[in-house]
Every structure is written in C-alpha cells, then in structure tokens.
C-alpha cells in the first residue's frame, strides 16, 4: 500500500462515515461506536460496507463485519485488506 494511501485512508473513511451518519467530520472520533454513538442502523452499515468495498476494491469477509464498530477498527481492517492485496 502506498504511503499516500495510508496517510489519507483515515481521513477518507472518516469523511465517508460522517456523510453516512449525517455528522460533521470533526464529530467522528476514532473510538465512537457506530451504533451506540452515531446512530448507525443496518442500512447505514450496509451503505458503509458497499462504499468501502467499491472505493478500495476490497472484499470484506462476513466474519469481519462484527469487527467494524468504530473508525479505528474500520481503518485497521481496510489497511490489512489492502496490504493483503499487494
């Protein structure tokens, strides 16, 4: 994964989550729970999943979905999946 992608990855995903949650990017902290703190429902989670898979050309395995509870976990998973593609 290129250095530029790594540096921008967190900001890109933060922006994506803010758009889905209809919040300002500054409100999306690394450890805020998507469901409890940001009000995500199943449709919002599916929207995030679809956007992540399309933007980064990755496939997030079903067993990994339960690990996507906050920004930091999501960034870490996407980094790992991108690294595995190289």
Predicted stretch roles:
Residues 2-26, 78-86:
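Thiotemplate assembly-line natural product biosynthesis machinery
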Residues 44:
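Two-component histidine kinase catalytic core, primarily the HATPase_c
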Residues 63-73:
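AMP-binding/adenylate-forming catalytic domain of the ANL superfamily
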